[in-house]
Design a protein with these regions (language model features):
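Positively charged N-terminal leader segments that act as targeting/secretion signals
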Residues: 5-27, 31
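Intrinsically disordered, polybasic Lys/Arg-rich low-complexity tracts
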Residues: 674, 678-777
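Intrinsically disordered, low-complexity, compositionally biased regions/tails
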Residues: 18, 23-28, 642, 755, ...
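Compositionally biased, intrinsically disordered low-complexity segments enriched
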Residues: 10-11, 32-34, 199, 718, ...
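Active-site and adjacent substrate-binding regions of carbohydrate-active enzymes
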Residues: 29-631, 635-689, 704
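Intrinsically disordered, low-complexity regions enriched in Ser/Pro/Gly/Gln/His and often acidic
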Residues: 12, 16-19, 44, 648, ...
């Protein structure tokens, strides 16, 4: 042990030295105690605790930063911090041996969730299968969809008549009785783990229901519990807040405060009047909410979706969005999960423009959220569907491609929520597009009110005063499939299915984790029955929150049905994505210029594989004016195809691939129906350097890797093997290493590929319309 001078007054004040060994205030050295080999700890902190060695090691890794951030946020409240540490150990001890083994496996393979084999599915438990036991019974179907990431929408206890779809939680320790119990949740998670699937659950951290125990005691006048919310005796301070805080629901729930009759005070309610904002400036709130999160992790939840993340810190005179303290809180929660349950990931819900989304990843050294939603790309995609003009989407993808490979986005077409038009209007100004009339055009088109549109959506939270509204509807209905079936128009049905499949192909081309909204795999349509329910009628989001139609799901096996055509096509695309390393997150990605504003063209390169992906957002035939000199093969059919002046049918796509330093081998997918392609000869491609493709923005891996990284990569197969070992023959979801994939290619003989059953493109019976120009509002 190395003893040096220590300032007792500084220690009493809780001031930290941030690991330098010198107090930044009094410049006096701290006293250190040797711990293990190279780790030092301040004497009297936690090394004397009778805690598990693994927990101590993990806590030691984060202790200095954790205490510094906590003390800065909570004014050196040592008692609250000590409670926080004790609470973390309590949940570490309660964690099952099985989950602890999962933690160790995932620590050995920290990028386990970044593989190109990851596919998510988002669902409401009651809509999909009635309850948690019902979901468990349908795991075979979920697995048949290729899903290994199951996201269950809010299922914790909430008042039936004031639940906001489960986002008004009255008890974070109980499941809604009609959905099951916490034991049912743990059993479902255990079954998912056995199948190599992970479970995601929403954690509503910004607010509670007014029926929560804390809220009830606050209503009763208990000051301690009123301090966990934002209570004010009159409207003076709330009025000051209102000057700078935007309204979330200006039409249906105006303002950010509500009068609480029982308490005789004003309370902050950013969302709905029955959802009370939590005061995270109170350390008791942070400690107890973190404990609630860790409790969910101990019931087998692998991914915690942090709902309404940007809103959780409030300060008068600010917008109460994206404040620096929010990032401190998320960073502390990230470290807490790494100490207690390092197999758990944080998914941030940040529904804002890209410049405000990306900071929630944190930094490489100090990460915050492991994953974030790619909200802007989703909205830009539907903008492109309505305008048939890819320029905004191309601009958006360039911004995404410029980000580091370490950032993992969840990509999706539709989800439980509405489509908000938070587009880059500064960029659109150069094309003469103004925000308000453009939003009206988008909403009109996707409701079928514009000329040539067969989309069927509904407005949500319409604000005529501002000319603003958001949009609801399922993917299939927005693609025109609902209208085509209603009209019994087979030509329109082909076109709608073609658009639906093309959009999913674009989704699967992006780096990150693609997530399906349950029902989209069979083209489920809008559910208008919500209009008849007095509780749901005012919320048009229930239009796309209908019950899973299991009779229709059975039609996925009936050749020629809408369900069969979409299901089979998506499974084909998902299996191809999982097979080829070019879809890995580490791939270089760039935009290709096709000299046609109706076609989006994307390039990907990784591990000797180069992919060109083309997407025609026009309903008419279009040509991508490219001139690539390599030999390419269609990944869906195995046919050789030149990447020169490619003519594409309306609402179609192409995945063309070539390889360098190895022959192209068409992978087989036995689960899919295949038709043989005759007279195809696969020739070895001469080894060549990666060509300088035309691109505007590229995500480049470092040319030279540090020696430490190379050593880590050399050990990667062993790490993967360790990650795969788990009790009771349970299976983790890990990626193939590049070395393993290269070995598979080497061992596989070069042979002519069996052709895939091609994704069905529309075969118009009606004459094609004249070539279109970008639509004006």
């Amino acid at each position: 042990m190395k003893s040096i001078t220590f300032n007792k007054q500084t220690k009493k004040a809780g001031i930290l030295c941030m690991g330098t060994g010198v107090c930044r205030v009094c410049k006096v050295l701290y006293k250190y105690t040797m711990y293990n080999k190279n780790t030092y700890r301040r004497e009297g902190m936690f090394e004397d605790k009778n805690w598990d060695a693994i927990f101590k090691k993990r806590l030691a890794r984060h202790y200095d930063e954790m205490k510094w951030l906590y003390s800065e946020l909570y004014h050196n409240d040592q008692q609250a911090f000590n409670y926080f540490c004790e609470m973390m150990y309590d949940y570490y001890e309660k964690r099952s041996p099985l989950l602890k083994e999962w933690d160790e496996a995932r620590e050995a393979s920290p990028d386990w969730y970044k593989g190109n084999d990851m596919l998510g599915m988002l669902m409401y438990t009651n809509c999909f299968a009635g309850n948690l036991k019902g979901v468990k019974k349908h795991l075979d179907y979920i697995q048949e969809c290729g899903v290994n990431y199951l996201h269950l929408m809010p299922l914790l206890e909430s008042p039936k008549d004031r639940s906001d779809g489960g986002y008004a939680v009255s008890d974070f320790r109980k499941v809604q009785p009609e959905l099951g119990t916490m034991d049912d949740l743990a059993a479902l998670a255990d079954d998912c783990h056995t199948r190599g699937m992970c479970v995601c659950l929403d954690f509503v951290m910004n607010h509670t229901s007014e029926d929560h125990e804390w809220a009830k005691r606050a209503k009763a006048g208990e000051k301690e519990y009123q301090d966990r919310f934002f209570f004010y005796d009159d409207w003076t301070i709330p009025s000051e807040f209102e000057k700078t805080v935007p309204q979330v629901f200006p039409q249906t729930a105006p303002g950010n405060f509500s009068w609480c009759e029982e308490a005789g005070k004003v309370v902050m309610t950013t969302f709905w009047p029955y959802q009370w904002d939590l005061n995270y400036a109170n350390p008791v709130v942070f400690n107890d909410m973190t404990a609630d999160m860790l409790n969910l992790c101990n019931h087998g939840v692998d991914i915690i979706r942090l709902d309404a993340t940007p809103y959780i810190w409030k300060e008068i005179g600010t917008p109460c969005r994206n404040l620096p303290q929010v990032h401190t809180l998320v960073r502390l929660m990230h470290m807490a999960s790494e100490v207690v349950c390092p197999g758990t990931l944080l998914l941030g819900e940040v529904v804002m423009e890209p410049s405000k989304v990306v900071p929630y990843f944190g930094t490489i050294d100090k990460p915050e959220c492991h994953m974030l939603y790619n909200v802007t790309t989703m909205a830009s995609t539907w903008h492109t569907v309505a305008t048939h003009d890819v320029r905004l989407l191309r601009h958006q993808m360039e911004a995404v491609f410029a980000l580091p490979h370490q950032y993992t986005f969840l990509n999706y077409l539709r989800c439980h929520d509405d489509i908000g038009w938070g587009l880059d209007y500064e960029y659109l100004k150069q094309f003469g597009i103004s925000e308000v009339p453009h939003k009206k055009y988008l909403n009109d088109y996707l409701r079928g009110l514009a000329f040539g549109s067969d989309a069927r959506g509904e407005l949500y939270n319409d604000d005529p005063r501002l000319g603003d509204a958001r949009l609801c509807g399922t993917t299939a209905s927005l693609c025109g499939i609902e209208a085509a079936e209603y009209e019994k128009n087979s030509w329109k049905l082909d076109r709608g299915i073609g658009l639906d499949i093309m959009l999913h192909a674009f989704l699967l081309t992006q780096s990150g984790i693609p997530v399906l909204y349950a029902g989209d795999e069979i083209g489920q349509l809008n559910d208008y029955t919500y209009h008849e329910d007095p509780i749901k009628a005012e919320d048009s989001r229930y239009l796309h929150r209908g019950d899973m139609n299991w009779d229709n799901a059975a039609l996925r096996n009936v050749e020629g049905t809408r369900e069969n055509r979409i299901f089979k096509a998506l499974r084909q695309l998902e299996e191809i994505r999982a097979e080829y390393s070019v879809f890995e997150s580490e791939a270089d990605t760039w935009i290709i210029e096709p000299w046609n504003d109706h076609i989006l063209a994307i390039g990907r390169y990784y591990n000797g594989e180069k992919l060109l992906a083309f997407f025609n957002f026009s309903e008419n035939e279009q040509t991508a004016w490219v001139n690539e000199y390599e030999d390419y093969y269609d990944l869906l059919t195995g046919e050789r195809k030149a990447a020169k002046a490619i003519t594409m049918p309306g609402y179609s796509f192409l995945w063309l691939m070539t390889t360098f330093n190895k022959p192209f081998v068409k992978k087989q997918h036995p689960k899919l129906d295949r038709k043989p392609v005759e007279n195809i000869v696969i020739e070895e491609v001469e080894p060549a350097k990666k060509p300088a493709a035309k691109k505007t923005t590229t995500r480049k891996a470092a040319a030279k890797k540090p020696a430490a990284k190379k050593a880590a990569e050399a050990k990667e197969p062993a790490a993967k093997k360790a990650a795969a070992k788990k009790p009771a023959a349970k299976k983790t979801t890990t990626r193939k290493t590049a070395a393993k994939k290269a070995a598979e290619v080497k061992e596989t003989p070069v042979e002519a590929p069996a052709a895939a059953a091609p994704v069905e493109a529309p075969a118009p019976a009606a004459p094609a319309a004249p070539a279109e120009t970008p639509k004006a509002e």
